[in-house]
Amino acid sequence: FLPIPYSDDTVKMIILTSENKKHDFYTLDTIKKHNELKESIIKHQVAFITHGFTSSATAEHFLAVAEALLDKGNYLVIMIDWRVAACTNEIAGVKLAYYNYAVSNTRLVGNYIATVTKMLVQKYNVPMANIRLIGHSLGAHISGFAGKKVQELGLGKYSEIIGLDPAGPSFKSQECSQRICETDANYVQIIHTSNHLGTERTLGTVDFYMNNGKNQPGCGLPIIGETCSHTRAVKYFTECIRHECCLIGVPQSKNPQPVSKCTRNECVCVGLNAKTYPKTGSFYVPVESKAPYCNNKGKKI
């Protein structure tokens, strides 16, 4: 059995606002005929959410991210569903054998997002400063490729790309042009949670290493709990959007300072407001094993 060849028709979009939460799927052609889109975009920030290998836009943890954004009331969320090209529909026993096939589709899906972005900018006058991309695993690299493509198209840079535990296999040794990179947007935020499915390599403007970027609390033994750790990046980010917790990043060092001594000029809160902090670089983030994952006794900076 061979995976279905990639085409733009194999990628679907779900368009959500706080007023419209129906999980209707759109293609590139049908979105152009979506008459309500213009009015929706004018009023909102735009966030693309992109899943990874063998997943889908309707996976529970991605819908939770969308819901958290919509609860803020000022977002239009475009969920990219590339499940066919991500081998989600393949027979369970052979999915892993098709990983490289999914990898080869990442740039194509990134170009697809860039095409949608071009339509938003040129047809609906959406400023690039109003658009942020959020991607998990392979979806993080897809977001990076979209960031490269919109620059090639002369559209400028996205406001921000947030990479949720970018996939390590096939990417960790690649140069900037072949993976998500700090130049792909005005601000690139990376949340590291696993060192096998993800990567410990610094990739962004800021790199947050949750529990040192591996073996997340509550996920069990190393290797066995790797999938749990890999997905935990999405859950941490969702909690940060909800503001139930400020996950504070401390500058990485051999002996990182206690969170209790953090100031706004030295440390950074993970999430949508990270780019409002002056510090960039790599940060260690202590976390707990259960939601909301805080390990700072409610401290905010």
Curated annotation (Swiss-Prot):
Annotated organism of origin: Vespa tropica
An MF annotation (GO) of this entry: phospholipase A1 activity
GO cellular component, one term: extracellular space
Gene Ontology terms describing biological process: killing of cells of another organism; lipid catabolic process
Protein name: Phospholipase A1 VesT1.02
Tissue: Expressed by the venom gland.
Lineage: Eukaryota, Metazoa, Ecdysozoa, Arthropoda, Hexapoda
PTM description: Is not glycosylated.
Gene3D superfamilies membership: alpha/beta hydrolase (3.40.50.1820)
Entries under Pfam families matching the protein: Lipase
Stated role: Catalyzes the hydrolysis of phosphatidylcholine with phospholipase A1 activity. Shows hemolytic activity.
